[in-house]
Amino acid sequence: MKLLEDKILKEGILLEGNILKVDSFLNHQMDVKLFNEIGKEFKRRFEGCSINKILTIEASGIGIATIVSQYFDFCPVVFAKKVDAANMDKDTYESKVHSFTKNKTYNVRVSKKYINKGDKILLIDDFLANGCAALGLIDIIKQGGAELIGVGIAIEKGFQKGRKELEKVGAKVESLAILDKIENDKVYFK
């Protein structure tokens, strides 16, 4: 998606360790106009797919998933919680997820009320690196007896193993901007 690639080139900041900082438009301050175009593009890429729920993980995927929802008949958006809260149902699906960016492992949870047998789920997230977050969410989808329709990613680090890991479990992966490499303080797209 050229619009997203241009935004990355213009506003993205490269940090040590192949970390691309896009907090000015994607995962801290949100460019809603860009998110709207992202939603349209995911609708185009998953056209004809029967989707009745969108699943993401807190926190950065929530904004994108919410906008994407309007292009799939405003289907519910469910997000896996990383932190145990007093008001969280005790009856949950759980999976361990390792964050590449934070180098931390989380036990993510979704209430069993919100993932049901027969649900057709589109997984949405801001980044794909090693695939750990997406694999954890796919595990939760399976625990609930639901069906994964596909995985929509805003930015994929194509030089990491995430896509391969997701394709191993049969996931259809659609990424809007695929980084081929980060070299000499420059981003190169596939």
Swiss-Prot record:
Protein purpose: Converts the preformed base xanthine, a product of nucleic acid breakdown, to xanthosine 5'-monophosphate (XMP), so it can be reused for RNA or DNA synthesis.
Primary location class: cytoplasm
Stated family: Belongs to the purine/pyrimidine phosphoribosyltransferase family. Xpt subfamily.
Keyword Magnesium annotated: no
Protein name per its UniProtKB record: Xanthine phosphoribosyltransferase 2
SUPFAM superfamilies: PRTase-like (SSF53271)
Localisation: Cytoplasm
Gene giving rise to this polypeptide: xpt2
InterPro entries xref list: PRibTrfase_dom, PRTase-like, Pur/Pyrimidine_PRTase, Xanthine_PRibTrfase
